[in-house]
Design a protein with these regions (language model features):
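A composition/biophysics-driven feature that prefers long, compositionally simple stretches
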Residues: 1-180, 238
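Short catalytic-site patches enriched in acidic/histidine residues
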Residues: 55-65, 152-157, 161, 192-245
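C-terminal helix-coil-helix/basic helical segment that borders enzyme active sites and/or dimer interfaces
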Residues: 185-192
């Protein structure tokens, strides 16, 4: 195998223009500034978010794990998502803030990206409820001398207080669910397989979502529909079992 020293390890992959986000710039600035307010009170130099929910909430980018790590670093004056090269420029387009990409040429390139974004930081907030023991050890090895403090609970309380924009989107989501429920009820009949009912419901919701937003990523919309014995658990998967009268 050849040497990888001359390969790109951390880079900017700013392909295209920023995409439409469901929340305004003012709303996203508010969220990031809430983090900075906590940093100031807690004497923290930078925050590294790693969970789906926090990265999505504070940047607008929802990652797909696919065996690679993702992050978002918030400092006093900047917010940057960290993504894998497999995603191309999409994370940049979906991030409120900057983005850097790491390649697969070295296994520790993700940590190189973190070091690049947290130079000089002595106290860094991480999500204790998301960073497992091996992950924590790798962070300590990558950032020697840095003290890690928990931002997980503080960020949870920040996300708990909903803004007017969030409440509006929640109401739209509830209405979409009502439309899916109506389509589900209409499709139910003896002899119809569960999956056909679920398809009718999910399709109705997807069309509603697609029609109500100027640009939207259509993902993770589905219907849990069960019949007969399958109704004994809330999260029992859809099957091809036919509905009995």
């Amino acid at each position: 195998m050849g040497h990888t020293d001359d390969m790109l390890h951390v880079m900017e992959w700013h392909n295209g223009d920023k995409s439409y986000l469901p929340f305004s710039e003012a709303e996203m600035d508010r969220r990031q500034n809430d983090v900075r307010g906590w940093m100031s009170k807690s004497d923290v130099d930078a925050v590294l978010f790693t969970s789906y929910h926090c990265i999505n909430y504070y940047s607008g980018f929802l990652y797909c794990y696919f065996g690679r790590k993702y992050g978002m670093v918030v400092t006093a004056d900047k917010a940057t998502t960290i993504s894998a090269g497999i995603d191309g420029g999409q994370p940049y387009r979906r991030s409120h803030g900057d983005n850097i990409t790491y390649s697969d040429w070295n296994r520790d390139n993700f940590y190189k990206a973190i070091r690049q974004l947290t130079k000089g930081a002595k106290r860094i907030g991480i999500e204790f409820d998301h960073v497992h023991l091996d992950y924590r050890k790798a962070l300590e090895e990558a950032l020697p001398g840095v003290e890690f403090v928990d931002v997980g609970q503080a960020s949870m309380w920040m996300r708990t207080i909903k803004s007017d924009e969030e409440i509006k989107l929640i109401k739209e989501g509830a209405n979409t669910c009502d439309i899916g429920g109506a389509a589900c009820a209409e499709a139910i009949a003896a002899g119809v397989p569960e999956h056909e009912v679920a398809i009718a419901s999910t399709s109705a919701m997807l069309r509603e979502i697609a029609g109500n937003h100027p640009y939207v990523e259509l993902m993770d919309t589905w219907t849990w529909f069960q019949s007969g014995i399958n109704t004994d658990g809330a999260h029992n998967p859809v099957t091809n079992k036919k509905i009995e009268s």
